[in-house]
């Protein structure tokens, strides 16, 4: 299922990109298309969170890794101008941590992300966009353990985020969306007061969904 979402998002992005490059017949505006200053865009996506995990210190020696997850995500974009938008992304997941000595348990991850976006071809039906911003990650419901002891972790981190996506308008208000984000996040871990090192999660987030313009 992970590969299916990635393949679907990649296919959608390529298809929409080809339509955009094809010219006026597919990408040009019409009275019922486009986004403009003051518009709100709300999207609901299915996303695959694919961590690029690596650990330092003991975590690195143990080969600590973080499993993929598929979850729903919702985001809200406000168009400050015809081309510039501000997006807030909301979603949460439960990720399992593994190591060379076996499963270490799971932890909840809540990573609200705020992005400044630039939307190309704002008056058209096919609208690529790019974004950059900041991510705050809250780690909660920590269920990590090793050797019969609980593993303590820092409960938050800050990091940058980058984004590329495409909206394809199908009616006056409804559009479909493909989106790829890279988010940097990490947490420090300890066991019995002894540092285990830092776990960098740094996921690639691939999503496919639908949206509505207000």
Q: Can you describe what each PLM-predicted range is?
A:
Residues 95, 171-214:
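Predominantly the C-terminal beta-signal and adjacent terminal strand-loop region
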Residues 38, 68-72, 106-112, 126, ...:
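Residues that define the transmembrane beta-barrel architecture of outer-membrane proteins
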Residues 28, 46-50, 75-146, 203-214:
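Gram-negative (and chloroplast) outer-membrane scaffold detector with strong preference
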Residues 54-60, 96-104, 140-150, 188-195:
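Outer-membrane beta-barrel translocator domains and adjoining extracellular loop/strand segments
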Residues 25-76, 141, 211-213:
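Short glycine/proline- and aromatic-enriched beta-strand/turn motifs that initiate or cap beta-hairpins
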Residues 111-116, 131-136, 155-166, 180-182:
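Hydrophobic alpha-helical segments of small multi-pass membrane proteins
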